[in-house]
A protein has these predicted regions:
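Acidic/glycine-rich phosphate/pyrophosphate-binding loops and surrounding catalytic core
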Residues: 1-76, 80, 92-97, 102-106, ...
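Active-site loop ensemble at the mouth of alpha/beta enzyme cores that anchors a bound cofactor
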Residues: 142-145
């Protein structure tokens, strides 16, 4: 997501060369349950259970936007929880809630290069900083003869 069409592999390579990591290349690497999926299923738990039933063994990541949804996702046993648009204090609380779980936490939404260190300090496992790919400065080059 949020990469230039046709350039995803190169952009993700650039992130790795800059010291970042990619925990997925495409959405086919696992199931990503977003807010619309949760709404359609009726609950976080139901959305997770449907994916587990249809795609046993697939890595499941679920997007949550509050701590109650986080607790529900942890109870349902997902691999990764994406904390969407949570501020630093909410993120710290999420890390505390999940501290005894094997589930990984990813902060996303509102992260910028300038505040990434503060989010990293909360103890989350992953930071989704979209600006690394969708807002990277362009290189002005020309082929003048």
């Amino acid at each position: 997501r949020k990469t230039t069409p046709g350039l995803r592999e190169l952009e993700k390579y650039a992130v790795r060369m800059g010291g970042g990591t990619n925990h997925r290349m495409t959405l086919t690497d696992g199931a990503l349950i977003k807010d619309n999926h949760i709404a359609a299923a009726g609950s976080v738990t139901e959305a997770i259970n449907r994916v587990k039933k249809e795609f046993p063994g697939v890595e499941i990541e679920v997007e949550v936007d509050n701590l109650e949804q986080l607790k529900e996702a942890l109870q349902a046993g997902v691999d990764i929880v994406l904390l969407d648009n949570m501020n630093i204090e909410q993120t710290k609380a999420a890390v505390e809630i999940a501290k005894n779980s094997k589930t990984k936490l990813e902060s996303s939404g509102g992260l910028k290069i300038e505040n990434a260190a503060a989010y990293a300090a909360t103890g989350v496992h992953y930071l989704a900083v979209g600006a690394l790919t969708h807002s990277a400065p362009v290189l002005d080059i020309g082929l003048d003869f």
